[in-house]
Amino acid sequence: MLRFYLFISLLCLVRSDTDETCPSFTKLSFHSAVVGTELNVRLLLYTRKNYTCAQIINSTTFGNLNVTKKTTFVVHGFRPTGSPPVWLQDLVKALLMVEDMNLVVVDWNRGATTVIYTQASNKTRKVAIILKEFIDQMLARGASLDDIYMIGVSLGAHISGFVGKMYNGQLGRITGLDPAGPLFNGKPPQDRLDPSDAQFVDVIHSDTDALGYKEPLGNIDFYPNGGVDQPGCPKTIFEAGMQYFKCDHQMSVYLYLSSLRKNCTITAYPCDSYRDYRNGKCINCGLPQGKPCPLLGYYADNWKDYLSEKDPPMTKAFFDTAEKEPYCMYHYFVDIITWNKSIRRGSITIKLKDEAGNTTESKINHEPVTFEKYHQVSLLARFNQDLDKVAEISLVFSTGAVIGPKYKLRILRMKLRSLAHPERPQLCRYDLVLTENVETPFQPIVCQKLQM
């Protein structure tokens, strides 16, 4: 009998450990991934009332959920090791800081945890059906589809799309963070995320050559660094092991997070291709002068009205990032008119220095440019720092040749203009000669009103 009571007491202790005061995302072991897991969806609610302590909610128990407020669902993807997403709590905190909302973390780790990707992929529609059942109960209590926002990561992006399809695209918004590519590439719209799944669909593609989806899936599709090989991520498996496989894929989440923290605002440029963007062909955003370019992340829907004027209401947008947070690059245009008798072909490096002595350098990442007499060449330059009062500019001209004569580039006029701050005065230099591979510093002046 004593053994029996001891056994019951131990069971009670185990039960009390399981029923946490603050429920957390399901944490599983790699063993669970090897043997596979049955689907079990838990909904963890965070609000400003309980932003550090989640509530388990379901179709009958709503906790602190207020149906009159915006409700954001965060849906994760494939979990091959069973661990919680490393970015999850940062995303929860950042979202609740920018807006008073209901934040629901969709925990389907039991189901997503498996070493066999197809098993997790096959459960995505089941997760979507469960979410629809919950949203139906929200609607019955007075919620509006306009106020439903879904953020889906990898497989979670397609789950969000499946939910949206069941409401005929009437959800307020879906954000896809590097939607999964394997098993979804080439699928018809009914089998993946699609622009018609919500009133507004924005997508960040950060790993299109491996785990992500390459083609556009939203009303606006952002391609940081062309959608491949993100700066700061390891280039080989020997540098960082498993991080090599997932770093590019996860970068979509960290870029989205940066838009919430407001350390800087990442501006993107609608363009047909990354190549055209890098060559400076897409800086007016396809809008009348003075209209803002789209912003990456949480505030991307500010561009919804501009997109509605397009037919179809879709666009691709490109931008470059720095290697680490805050990720912003500051864009300038460098307009150059030369007067060499002979054609020159090469690239330009530019360095800026402000009045305090701070410097920032940009290799103007373009294909070799042809400089012809009296023809203007416009180059897009990107810098890690934004220097307000530029006191000195340095230029280096290079043809890329290792041997042979050093050529000169004779500049009739160089003009520097900020894309991020068009109100700043444009800076010029007239009658300048660059010797190949030699840094040439000079003090710019405010451009004259009459230009060639």
UniProtKB/Swiss-Prot annotation:
Residues 1-16 form the signal peptide. It catalyses: 1-hexadecanoyl-2-(9Z-octadecenoyl)-sn-glycero-3-phosphate + H2O = 2-(9Z-octadecenoyl)-sn-glycero-3-phosphate + hexadecanoate + H(+). It is an enzyme of class 3 (hydrolase). Its main location: secreted. Glycans are attached at N50, N66, N122, N263. It is a peripheral membrane protein. Its EC number is 3.1.1.-. InterPro entries: AB_hydrolase_fold, Lipase, Lipase_LIPH, Lipase_N, TAG_lipase. Expressed in liver and lacrimal gland. Keywords: Cell membrane, Disulfide bond, Glycoprotein, Hydrolase, Lipid degradation, Lipid metabolism, Membrane, Secreted, Signal. The active site is at S154 (nucleophile), D178 (charge relay system), H249 (charge relay system). Disulfide bonds join C233-C247, C271-C282, C285-C293, C428-C447. GO terms for cellular component: extracellular space; plasma membrane. GO terms for biological process: lipid catabolic process. It comes from the Eukaryota. It is found in: Secreted; Cell membrane. GO terms for molecular function: carboxylic ester hydrolase activity; phospholipase activity. Belongs to the AB hydrolase superfamily. Lipase family. PANTHER family: LIPASE, LIPASE MEMBER H. Interacts with TTMP/C3orf52. Hydrolyzes specifically phosphatidic acid (PA) to produce 2-acyl lysophosphatidic acid (LPA; a potent bioactive lipid mediator) and fatty acid. Does not hydrolyze other phospholipids, like phosphatidylserine (PS), phosphatidylcholine (PC) and phosphatidylethanolamine (PE) or triacylglycerol (TG). This is Lipase member H. It comes from Oryctolagus cuniculus (Rabbit).
